[in-house]
Amino acid sequence: DRGIVTNLCGYPDSSFTECSIRNKHTFTIDPEGYLYKCWEIIGDQKYAIAKLDSEGTIQSIDQKILNRYLYAADPLEDKTCSKCPYLPICFGGCPHKRIENIFKDKHYDTCTYLKGSLKEFIKIHLSQNS
């Protein structure tokens, strides 16, 4: 807890905003038994962190990929995100895109769609809930 309040005005709270990538207990399994941390990349085996055998036992884990997903996508470690007033709403955007930006020199925009239009969103929210 870093003092970020997220449950104001119906905004998502921290237990639901960040995706499965950074949750150590969450995996997605494809039909061939490959395990992924993100459902957006399911089927792309270069992102698989492990594979289940026919008995359902996890085979060797790709610790490099797993560690990147669990630890490298922290938006609080990003100077831009850590200073952004929208961080409590978006939590840094998509962790997979953040990891691709860091390790594969991609240039995905991870900012929330609310950035730049939050005042309008709040006005609409208040007008609908008054």
Listing of model-derived features with the role each one plays in the protein:
Residues 1-11, 40-85:
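C-terminal accessory region of radical SAM enzymes
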Residues 1-44, 89:
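A C-terminal junction/extension of Radical SAM enzymes
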Residues 46, 76-130:
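Radical SAM enzyme core and accessory elements
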